């Protein structure tokens, strides 16, 4: 039996979205911006928040698998803290920081869900808005790179770090900001070593991305989604594989390089988007 061409096209689109998601979720360049812009440039239209949020589950599978030893250490540290009161152990402090850092975006996301029903179609998701935000975030990341020294490591993390970086993570609800970009920028401003800042950003993102994906799971798998379950599953799988590769590359890259390449990319991305939008708007 010949497969339905509509289903094949839906699988191809979600595969591409998964690759884009995997490449951009953990790099400080905004997955939301690229998941909005790439389909528009391809003539597919905006896939919507529900589909893109669920495809993010592939990234979560990757980050949990990649940091499984760290997460096991956190669980062991928290367990030991409850049993023996060892709250100053690095693993316990990391767990507390992750919990504290998740609360701000959880509260903000809930407020948006309850009180801003038009968020998914608001002007914040427009191409010019995303372009401007990308340029602003590039400048902030570039400025953070100028500060020093880079001394703080992951084993020094505490509740204050969780709160500071967690508050920065809230800004990632603005399309184009980038969750990893906002948390990495905040960490660099606070004197973190780059690779350790990236590791904490990835770990902190696990609860936030998981919750966002699960909240939208029902809508993305509903009959209204093009092709039903299979295309979304394809997108999740491609996002998982590419996310793993992106995480591994970024951590190794930041061991010996600055974030300058991402500053330049985000500036060019924002400027080119504005040029493209201006040209299309005038036609």
Swiss-Prot record:
Record-listed E.C. numbers: 3.6.1.27
Catalyzed reactions: di-trans,octa-cis-undecaprenyl diphosphate + H2O = di-trans,octa-cis-undecaprenyl phosphate + phosphate + H(+)
Taxonomic superkingdom: Bacteria
Transmembrane regions: 47-67, 94-114, 127-147, 197-217, 227-247, 261-281
Cellular component, GO annotation: plasma membrane
Subcellular compartments: Cell inner membrane
Keyword Protease: no
InterPro entries, per database record: UppP (IPR003824)
GO BP term, pick one: regulation of cell shape
Topology class, membrane: Multi-pass membrane protein
Keywords recorded for this protein, A-Z: Antibiotic resistance, Cell inner membrane, Cell membrane, Cell shape, Cell wall biogenesis/degradation, Hydrolase, Membrane, Peptidoglycan synthesis, Transmembrane, Transmembrane helix
GO molecular function: undecaprenyl-diphosphatase activity
Enzyme kind, highest EC tier: hydrolase
Function noted in UniProt: Catalyzes the dephosphorylation of undecaprenyl diphosphate (UPP). Confers resistance to bacitracin.
Similarity section: Belongs to the UppP family.
PANTHER family, A to Z: UNDECAPRENYL-DIPHOSPHATASE (PTHR30622:SF4)
Note: Bacitracin is thought to be involved in the inhibition of peptidoglycan synthesis by sequestering undecaprenyl diphosphate, thereby reducing the pool of lipid carrier available.
Protein name: Undecaprenyl-diphosphatase
């Amino acid at each position: 039996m010949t497969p339905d061409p509509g289903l094949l096209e839906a699988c191809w689109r979600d595969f591409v979205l998964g690759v884009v998601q995997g490449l951009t979720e953990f790099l400080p360049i905004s997955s939301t911006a690229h998941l909005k812009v790439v389909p528009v440039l391809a003539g597919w239209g905006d896939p919507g928040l529900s589909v893109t949020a669920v495809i993010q589950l592939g990234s979560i599978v990757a980050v949990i698998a990649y940091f499984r030893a760290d997460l096991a250490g956190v669980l062991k540290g928290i367990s030991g803290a409850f049993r023996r009161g060892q709250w100053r152990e690095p693993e316990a402090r990391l767990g507390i920081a992750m919990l504290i850092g998740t609360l701000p975006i959880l509260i903000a996301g809930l407020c948006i869900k309850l009180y801003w029903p038009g968020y998914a179609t608001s002007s914040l998701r427009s191409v010019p808005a995303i372009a401007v935000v990308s340029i602003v975030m590039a400048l902030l990341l570039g400025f953070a790179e100028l500060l020093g020294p880079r001394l703080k490591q992951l084993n020094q993390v505490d509740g204050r770090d969780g709160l500071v970086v967690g508050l920065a993570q809230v800004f990632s609800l603005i399309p184009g900001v980038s969750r990893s970009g906002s948390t990495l920028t905040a960490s660099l401003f606070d004197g973190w070593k780059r690779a350790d800042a990236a590791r904490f950003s990835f770990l902190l993102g696990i609860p936030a991305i998981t919750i966002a994906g699960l909240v939208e799971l029902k809508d993305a798998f509903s009959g209204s989604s093009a092709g039903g379950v299979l295309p979304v599953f394809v997108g999740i799988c491609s996002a998982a594989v590419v996310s793993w590769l992106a995480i591994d590359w970024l951590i190794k890259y930041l061991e010996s390089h600055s974030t300058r390449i991402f500053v330049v990319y985000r500036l060019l991305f924002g400027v080119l988007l504005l040029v493209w939008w201006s040209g299309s708007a005038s036609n």
